[in-house]
């Protein structure tokens, strides 16, 4: 997977230049050039809900702050999203919108969600006017739509990031409005105006960039990491529980960390205890980079962000 570094002009306008550098695992960085180092940049990153949307946004935010601690980052999300749980611990400010998804819901909930859209646009307008951003980036998720759309009509530069090969509904709509569309896969260009798109890979947080020494297999027990994304995966949880009877002869050689999500945590915990397994059961793993580095084998969903992070750690 190619690694790219992006050079933005000093006004963070609609002109971007890109240059390819060395190969690395699915990573790109927004790079403020030397001529722009003294400029204070204010950026809103909107969206989230799941780790697949949120963590690439955090990677971009970390890189802007690494370039200059005077740059300002504000996240816009929802009260129910993953962003509410973790952004404060990472030192980022978060403001929330009262907005819900529409796709895949019943008629009553769809109507309720539609009625919340005007309110979320008013909330976005107030947040943007108070913060005065140079750029608003949508990372996917419910809050991304109102915030990016509002910024567009306020003539603020906008961009979206699409991590998946098949873009979500929100990004497909926003693609018609924004100034730039940053893609992980070239195939995704078919869904957007091609002149706006740039294939850059999936942003990965700096904590996942490790040296070769930390990738060596650990001595002692075989470490197995099982997770299903930020919300857990019932199918993976059920499959692992079905496999436990076949692992009884390996118990003394095996250590498991299993991130279950909230719904299955009690059932999974009871099954591990009944089979006498050395297992740590968690709802959510904050330091995924450390979890990857300490594992010998990973069993997980093939989410775009998970694959990029796993590739970056050399697994």
Q: PLM features: residue spans?
A:
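An amphipathic, basic-hydrophobic alpha-helix
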Residues: 106-135
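Conserved nucleotide-sugar phosphate-binding/catalytic loop shared by glycosyltransferases and other
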Residues: 43-48, 70-116, 262-264
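Donor-nucleotide binding loops and adjacent catalytic segments primarily
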Residues: 81, 86, 90, 214-298
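Acidic donor-binding loop of glycosyltransferase active sites
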Residues: 133-135, 277, 293-308
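An aromatic- and histidine-rich active-site surface loop
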Residues: 81-85, 135-154
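N-terminal amphipathic/hydrophobic targeting modules at extreme N-termini
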Residues: 10-30, 35
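Active-site-proximal region of nucleotide-activated glycan assembly enzymes
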Residues: 24, 93, 152-213
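Conserved donor-binding/catalytic loop of nucleotide-activated donor transferases
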Residues: 154, 293-295, 309-315
């Amino acid at each position: 997977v190619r690694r790219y570094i992006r050079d933005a002009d000093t006004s963070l306008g609609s002109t971007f230049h890109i240059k390819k550098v060395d190969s690395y695992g699915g990573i790109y960085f927004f790079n403020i050039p030397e001529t722009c180092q003294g400029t204070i940049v204010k950026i809103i990153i909107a969206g989230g809900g799941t780790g697949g949307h949120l963590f690439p946004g955090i990677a971009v935010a970390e890189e802007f702050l690494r370039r200059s601690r005077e740059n300002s980052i504000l996240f816009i999300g929802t009260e129910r999203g993953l962003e509410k749980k973790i952004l404060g611990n990472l030192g980022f400010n978060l403001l929330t919108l009262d907005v819900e998804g529409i796709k895949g819901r019943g008629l009553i909930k769809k109507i309720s969600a539609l009625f919340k859209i005007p309110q979320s646009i008013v909330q976005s307008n107030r947040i943007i006017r108070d913060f005065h951003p140079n750029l608003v980036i949508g990372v996917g998720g419910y809050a991304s739509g109102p915030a990016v759309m509002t910024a567009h009509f306020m003539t603020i530069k906008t961009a979206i990031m699409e991590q998946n090969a098949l873009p979500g509904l929100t990004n497909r709509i926003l693609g018609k409005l924004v100034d730039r569309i940053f893609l992980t896969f070239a195939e995704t260009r078919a869904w957007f105006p091609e002149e706006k798109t740039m294939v850059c890979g999936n942003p990965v947080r700096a904590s996942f960039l490790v040296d070769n020494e930390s990738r060596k297999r650990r001595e002692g027990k075989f470490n197995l990491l099982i997770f299903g994304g930020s919300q857990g995966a019932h199918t993976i949880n059920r499959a692992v529980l079905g496999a436990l009877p076949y692992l009884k002869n390996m118990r003394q050689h095996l250590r498991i960390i299993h991130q279950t999500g909230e719904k299955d945590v009690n059932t999974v915990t009871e099954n591990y205890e009944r089979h006498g397994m050395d297992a740590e059961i968690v709802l959510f793993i904050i330091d995924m980079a450390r979890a990857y580095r300490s594992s010998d084998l990973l069993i997980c969903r093939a989410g775009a962000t998970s694959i990029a992070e796993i590739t970056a750690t050399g697994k």
